[in-house]
Each structure stands twice: as C-alpha cells, then as structure tokens.
From Swiss-Prot:
Stored NCBIfam families: MDH_euk_gproteo
UniProt lineage: Bacteria, Pseudomonadati, Pseudomonadota, Gammaproteobacteria, Alteromonadales
Assembly mode: Homodimer.
Active site: H177
Origin species: Psychromonas ingrahamii (strain DSM 17664 / CCUG 51855 / 37)
Gene: mdh
Gene Ontology terms: cellular component: cytoplasm
Entry similarity comment: Belongs to the LDH/MDH superfamily. MDH type 1 family.
Protein name per its UniProtKB record: Malate dehydrogenase
BP terms from Gene Ontology: malate metabolic process; tricarboxylic acid cycle
Length: 319
C-alpha cells in the first residue's frame, strides 16, 4: 500500500509523516512531497527510524513521482492560520493549491482515496470534488474531508470534564469543520450526563478549539501536532479498511447523500473501495437539532464558495 503526503514539509506534514512511519502496516510505502527543497531530507531523516515502512521524498513543482501508484493521498499543503484569522480567511491561497494538486491527482492517480486536511475543509473538499468531476474521475466514496481532529478534541474535553480516561470516551461529531458547523453530539455519549450549561460550554469549546491553539501559540502557528495525530488516526484506519479489515467506522466530511447538505460530516463504514456505507448519525437532542439547523446556511455558503471558485477558474482557463 502506498500513502502519499502532499505538503509533507509543513508543520502538519512532518508530524503526520512521522506518525505514519511509526504506525503504517509493514511494507507500506510512504511518499512525501512538498515544494520545499528540504522534503527529500525529511524522508531521509524518517528513513533512519527502524520500521518496515519505506520512505521516499520529492520536492519541486511537480508531484507526479510522489503520487504515481498511490492508494491514499493526504493533502495538508497550504498556509496555516494566524491570530485573528479564521479558516475562511485561508481560502484565497489554499483554494488554488487544492485545485492544482487535485487536478494532478486526477491525472496521475485517479483511483486513489483522497484525504483533505487543508483548511477551510468545508470549502476545499467541494473544490476537490468539482475538479475531479471536471476530469471525469469523481468517485464520492474516495474523497474525504478529514475532521477527526474535532472528534479527538471532543473526546479529550469530555474526558477532562468528567474525570474519565480519554480512550474510554467516544463522541460523534457531525456537520462541518469550522466554528458553528462543528456539532458534537454529546447527548449520545454512553454513561455520561451533562447539565445544560455544560453542553453549551463544551460545544462552544470544541467549536473554537482551533482558535484556542492559534492564540496560545501567539503567532507561532496553528494546531499542527493534534491535527497530525488526527489525520494519522483516520489514515491508518482507512488503510486497514482498504486492506480488507472489516467493521471500521470513522467520521469524515463527505458527499454522502445527506438531505441536509451536499457535504456533511457523519459516521462512515469504510471498506476496500473507500466508503462502504454512510451511516445515520442518530437521534439528536433538541439543542443539537437547533444547532444543526442553524449551521446549515453557513455550511451551504462554504460549499457554494468552493463550487463557484472552480467554475470561475475553469472558465478563465478556457477563455
């Protein structure tokens, strides 16, 4: 199995590459790509770690060598948030990066599963889908917005509040991957109860956790390490599912036929071809149902922004 990381020299990319080198199944190939000339050196550094995962690194403007034959392609390339920015502020730069990289994936590795990490995920996944459609290779079962960071934050914050081991807490997080579109379904957590105020405070903290990190780093970066952990967790499970392991369920932001929104984060049963089945996200409390309805206009606008971007740029290229 070959796994490619595009944006591998960045804060998320390097940490993600390390985790994948440690945790991918034996004899996997880990292929790293970035514009930065340091990328082959990152691969060389990782290659000294004693695991049976082969690492290769590529730098420059053409990612072809990195993605040829890849089964899974993880895209973290782009600029990171700085204080005062939200994920939508990243759009103008990151939209073009995603469009160009996904266009190359469509050309070189059209059968690969693609995991989008680059923010704003609500929009960049829609961009990726439109690019793949334009190339005639779109498979909705193989395109994922990686939102696992919202899940691991929710699980950690609940465990912290209730004095529980983090590994014993499971939280279903639905919706999108920014601000109010992130909806932790706290009412479904087994064996844990919350006051109304705890639900309000926890929901807000989970939704704004990215800002919490950006501000704490005081201009020195965003949530690179926890995002790398989350992306690795998702990618490893996806690799296991592609290899035939059954019963693997992960949440991700996908084109899953949800009547609420063209793209929506919800539980997925993964299989040998990507998404095997989109699972229902279950019953919501009245608070959660209200929050879901309130988020939809934001989510729809984020998606339309991505669709419009691709439509306009493709039209400009033709003219």
């Amino acid at each position: 199995m070959k796994i490619a990381v595009l944006g591998a020299a960045g804060g998320i990319g390097q940490a993600l590459a390390l985790l994948l080198k440690l945790d991918l199944p034996a004899n996997s190939i880990l292929s790293l790509y970035d514009l930065a000339p340091v990328t082959p050196g990152v691969a060389k550094d990782l290659s000294h770690i004693p695991t049976s995962v082969k690492v290769e690194g590529f730098a420059g403007t053409d990612p072809t060598a990195a993605i040829e034959g890849a089964d899974v392609i993880l895209i973290s390339a782009g600029v990171a948030r700085k204080p005062g920015m939200d994920r939508s502020d990243l759009f103008n730069i990151n939209a073009g990066i995603i469009k160009n990289l996904v266009a190359k994936v469509a050309e070189v590795a059209p059968e690969a599963c693609i995991g989008i990490i680059t923010n704003p995920v609500n929009t960049t996944v829609a961009i990726a889908a439109e690019v793949l459609k334009a190339a005639g290779v779109y498979n909705k079962n193989k395109l994922f917005g990686i939102t696992t960071l919202d899940v691991i934050r929710a699980e950690e914050f609940v465990a912290e509040l209730k004095g529980l081991p983090s590994e014993d807490v499971r939280v279903n997080v639905i919706g999108g991957h920014s601000g109010t579109t992130i909806l932790p379904v706290l009412s479904q957590i087994q064996g844990v109860s919350f006051t109304d105020q705890e639900v309000i405070d926890l929901t807000s903290r989970i939704q704004n956790a990215g800002t919490e990190v950006v501000e704490a780093k005081a201009g020195g970066g965003s949530a690179t390490l926890s995002m790398a952990c989350a992306a690795s967790r998702f990618a490893i499970q996806l690799v296991h599912a592609l290899s035939g392991k059954q019963g693997i369920i992960q949440n991700a932001y996908v084109d899953g036929g949800n009547p609420a929104s063209p793209f929506f984060t919800q539980p997925l049963l993964l299989g040998k071809n990507g998404i095997d089945k989109v699972l229902p996200y279950g019953e919501l409390s009245s608070f959660e149902e209200t929050k879901k309805e309130e988020m939809l206009s934001v989510l729809h606008a984020d998606i339309e922004m991505g669709i419009d971007f691709v439509s306009k740029t493709l039209a400009a290229e033709v003219s």
